[in-house]
Amino acid sequence: MKRKIFYSHKEELWNAWSHSGGIVLGIVFGTIFLVWCFQERAGWATAGVILYLVGMLFSYVSSTVYHALSARSVWKERLRKWDHAAIYWHIAGSYSPITLTVLRNQGAWGWGLFSFVWLCAILGTISSLRKLRDHSNLETLTFIGMGLSVLVAFKPLADSLPISSIIWIVAEGVMYITGALFYSLNKRRYRSEERRVGKE
């Protein structure tokens, strides 16, 4: 008989606490960056940081609440959809500071990349809320594609930023891609366990 495989209580608590730590760090560093932007009267930088904070906090808050809920809660499945949708916002938000500042005056690179990642975020949110599967290759590929999209503007970025900033941007993209791949492999493992249990 087929049965649903859930994360253990300890795994869910760890996920909830780790993501709540992201909320705290996001608020602390976000406040520091916003204060700097206001002091410098950098309007575009302020907009970029705000979008980044919205995406990051949306991701961490929804994930914290989702993992903190009991598996029997009627809200668990609803929060799972928002948890997935928030990942798109987190990635798009990460691109906002560089596209609205460094790349904004580099021809079509800034607004083109900004429009692309936020369009992906909007479409991804709609897809997640309408019909979210336990595992979706399209979702995983979209996460990876958004993470790699910075490569199309790598030349103007390299011409405008110091090497230390480039390293941070590349590292962030690698983290997104690695996270998406691990998430995909983990879901495949649970799906194979479900099929095995269903045959017993």
Model-predicted segments: where are they?
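Conserved small/polar residues in nucleotide/adenosyl-binding loops
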Residues: 194-200
